C-alpha cells in the first residue's frame, strides 16, 4: 500500500473545508466493475474519511474472495478527487475448513463430522453460527479461529481451532431493588433457570419473563457476573403501582319501601399488595332501580412457592324484585407462565324467585358444573394508553341443574378474546369478542347469560339482555391525538337467542368515545346508541358513560 502518497494527500488537504471524492479503479475494465459493485462510499467530508474507506474496501475485497488484492498507487486527480488503483488478482471462491484438529466431542457438539466447504463471503457467518451453538450449550467464553491457511487448486484451506473453556451454568439469580419481591415467584424462576447452560439468549429469556410480570418494572437489562467458579445473573426490579379504583356512590329514598337506598358503582383492583403476586377485584353496581351486582374475585399465584394457582369468585346478581342469582367458582390451576394458566374447578349456581310466584320462565333452581379454563394475557406496560395487547379466556363446564328435585344435564362454553392491532404509531384497531353457549333440555330466564353495557355490546343498559346463546364482536378504531389522548369509534355487532322467552335478535351498537391519561389515572367518555333487528336508531335511546380510573 502506498502510504507515503496517502500521507502526502492528507497533509496537502488539511486547509480545505469541502467535500472530497473517492474513485477506485482496477487493472482492467472488469476489475473496475467489480470495485463499483462492492458499493464503496464515494463522497466524503475529509481526507481521513477517504483513508478509512480504503481500509474498508480492502476488507470487503478479502471477504469477496480477492485474497491477493492490493493497492497499487493513488493520486490526486484534482482539488477534491482522489483515485486509488487496485489489482484484484484471482478470485478464490471457496474456503475448505478442515476439522482434523478438533476432538470428537467438539465435532459432535458442532455437528461437524467432516470438513466443511463454504463460500469466502460466508466464512464470518459460518464462524458466528458455530460460536452461537457453543454459547447455547454453555460455552459462553469459547473462542474460534482459523489457522494455517494454504492455497490449493484455487481453493483456500484452513484448520478450525476451538478453545472451549469451561461450561458455564447459572449458579444463582440475584434480585436487586425490590426487597419484598414475591418469594413464590422468585422460587419458581430460580428453579427454572438455575443450572441451565449460560448464554445470552437465556439472559434475554429472563428479561422477557420478568417484563411480563404486571407488578414489577425492570429499570435496566439483567447483568451477568462471571467469576472463576460461578455465574450470577443480576435482575434489577422496582415495584409497579398497579392498583386501580373507579366509581361513585350516591343515595336516595326508595319510594315504595320508604327506605334509604344506595346507588352507584365501585370497581376496585388491588394487585400484589401482600407481595405475593395476588390479584383482588371487588365490583359493585346498583342502578337505584332494577338491578344490583356484587362480584368479588381473588387470584393467588405460585401457591406454596410452586406453579400452583388458586382462583375464587363470588357473584351475586339481583333483578328488581323478581329473582336473585348467586354463583361461586373455585379453580385450581397450573401456571405455565405468570400470564398463562390452565385451571380445573367447580362452579355452583343458585337462583331464587324473590316473589315466590311460580311462572313458566322463572323458577327456584340450582346447578353445579365441573369446569376447565385456559387463560392467557399479554400486556405492554411501555404503552401507557393501551397496555392490554392480547387476552384469551376459554371456559367449559359440564354438570347438572336441579329443579324441584329433578335433575337435568347441562353444558356451557364461553370464549372471550381481545386483540390490539397497531396500524402505525397513531392508528390502532381494538377488537373484543364474547361467545357463550348453554345447552339444556329446557331454559329459564334466571339461568341465562346476561350481557350488555360498556364491557359488552354498547348502546344497551348493563346486563339488560339475556340468552342461552350469545355472540358478539366489539370493534374500535383508535386514533392517538396526543401522547395522553386518543379518540375512537364504536362499532359493535351481536346476536343472541333466548329460548326461555322464545326470542332472538341481531344487535347493533354505534358511537364514539375518548380516553385521556393524566397523572391520576385514565378518564373515559363513551357515547353509544344501540338497536336490535334493524330498528332505527333514536337519539333518545343514546347512552353516555363516564368513568375515571385512578391508579395508586
Task: Kindly label every feature range from the protein language model.
Residues 54, 127, 372, 414-415:
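Short, hydrophobic/amphipathic alpha-helical packing segments
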Residues 34-35:
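Select transmembrane alpha-helical segments in multipass membrane proteins
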Residues 199, 206-393, 450-453, 463-467, ...:
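Gram-negative/organellar outer-membrane beta-barrel architecture
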Residues 139-144, 325-327, 411:
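Amphipathic hydrophobic-ligand
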Residues 1-24, 552:
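Bacterial Sec-dependent N-terminal signal peptides
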Residues 18-29, 38-253, 267, 281-288, ...:
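Periplasmic polypeptide-binding modules associated with outer-membrane biogenesis and secretion
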Residues 17, 263, 295, 390-552:
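C-terminal transmembrane beta-barrel domains of outer membrane proteins
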